[in-house]
Amino acid sequence: MNSLAIETQEPRAQAITINEDSLSVDLMDGRTIIAPLIWYPRLWYGTAEERNNFEIIGDGALIHWHDLDEDLSVGGILAGRRSGESQKSLKKWLEERRTRNL
């Protein structure tokens, strides 16, 4: 009996583009993922400058936004997972932002 093992690799980001409506992730294997920015409220509420201040870490497996305290896994984006942040947590974060920006 033969068994065929399919080798899979964790998706890895090569480049990120963010506009007012979407997050686009170019993968190392040539694919591009595009997700609505509204799925990630901290990115949605962040300024263009904050959204564009990101770092691809973990050999391309994660994207980190220091200014927004946000981390997304490339695998999660590919799987269509939205932010799991609670409304209570998001509300607190937004209030803290308003206080800092006064």
Residue ranges and their predicted role:
Residues 1-102:
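Motif-centric detector for short Cys/His coordination patterns
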